[in-house]
Regions:
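N-terminal cap/lid segment of alpha/beta-hydrolase-fold proteins
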Residues: 1-9
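Conserved HGGG/HGGXW glycine-rich cap/lid loop of the alpha/beta-hydrolase fold
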Residues: 11-65
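Structural signature of beta-strand start/N-cap positions in the alpha/beta core
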Residues: 25, 52, 89-92, 115-116
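Conserved alpha/beta-hydrolase "nucleophile elbow" surrounding the catalytic nucleophile
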Residues: 30-32, 91, 95-97
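Catalytic nucleophile-loop/oxyanion-hole region of alpha/beta-hydrolase
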Residues: 66-75
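Conserved acidic catalytic loop of the alpha/beta-hydrolase fold
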Residues: 74-91
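Flexible "cap/lid" loop of the alpha/beta hydrolase fold
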Residues: 101-144
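Conserved alpha/beta-hydrolase catalytic His-Asp/Glu region
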Residues: 134-189
Length: 192
C-alpha cells in the first residue's frame, strides 16, 4: 500500500489484503533503524485470522520517503495523520522496541482511536548509551553489531545469524536512520 502524507510517499504492507472497514486493524510499528519487513510473517498470520494488518515504514525507513522524524512525539503526531487519512479507528497497535515508545506516546495523545496496545521487547524508557549513538552517527557498522549483541543475545542460534543485521547494512542506513532513531529513543518523554 502506498499513500502520501505531507507530500511524502509512504509505504505500508497490508499483506496484500487491503483494508476492510468491517474488520479490526492491527498496526505493527518497527524498531530503530528497521522497516515493515520485520513484521512480514506476523502480518501474514494475523491477516489469516480475519484482521486487517498494516506494517508501516516510518518516514526515512524502508520504502518511505524521508527524512526520519527525530522525536517520538513527532512520530506519534505523524501516526495520527496516517490513521486519519486511512480512516482507521478501534486500533490494536503493536510496537517493537522504539515502536513501544511510539505507541505509548500515541496513546497519551490520541487514545480515542485505540482498542489495545501490545509491547514487544520494549519499555516506557529507552536510554541509549552515548557511545552507541556516536557509532551510529558515524555510520559505523559496530553500532548494529552491538545492538544485536545486547538486544538479541540468542541470535547466534539463528542459522545464518540474526536476519535483522542484514536489514541495517549501509553506512547511510546507520548514520541517517539508526542514529536518528536511537537519539529519539534516548530523548523520549515519559508520560506514565
Amino acid at each position: 500500500m502506498i499513500f502520501e502524507i505531507e507530500n511524502k510517499t509512504i509505504h505500508a504492507s497490508d499483506a496484500g489484503q487491503g483494508i476492510d472497514p468491517k474488520k479490526q486493524t492491527i498496526v505493527f510499528l518497527h524498531g530503530s533503524g528497521l522497516s515493515h519487513i520485520v513484521w512480514s510473517l506476523t502480518e501474514q498470520f494475523f491477516s489469516n485470522k480475519n484482521f486487517n494488518v498494516l506494517s508501516i515504514d516510518l518516514p526515512g525507513h524502508g520504502n518511505s520517503d524521508g527524512p526520519c522524524l527525530d522525536t517520538i512525539e513527532k512520530i506519534a503526531d505523524w501516526l495520527e495523520s496516517v490513521f486519519k487519512k486511512l480512516q482507521l479507528k478501534n486500533l490494536i497497535l503493536v510496537g517493537h522496541s522504539q515502536g513501544c515508545l511510539e505507541i505509548l506516546e500515541y496513546a497519551f495523545k490520541y487514545k480515542s482511536r485505540l482498542n489495545k496496545l501490545v509491547f514487544v521487547g520494549g519499555s516506557n524508557r529507552m536510554p541509549v548509551h552515548p557511545d552507541l549513538i556516536e557509532l551510529a552517527k558515524n555510520g559505523d557498522s559496530d553500532a548494529v553489531k552491538l545492538m544485536m549483541k545486547w538486544g538479541y543475545e540468542g541470535s547466534k542460534k539463528f542459522i545464518g545469524g540474526n536476519p535483522v543485521e542484514k536489514i541495517i547494512q549501509s553506512p547511510r542506513d546507520i548514520s541517517e536512520v539508526l542514529a536518528v532513531d536511537l537519539n529519539a529513543c534516548n530523548l523520549s518523554l515519559i508520560h506514565i
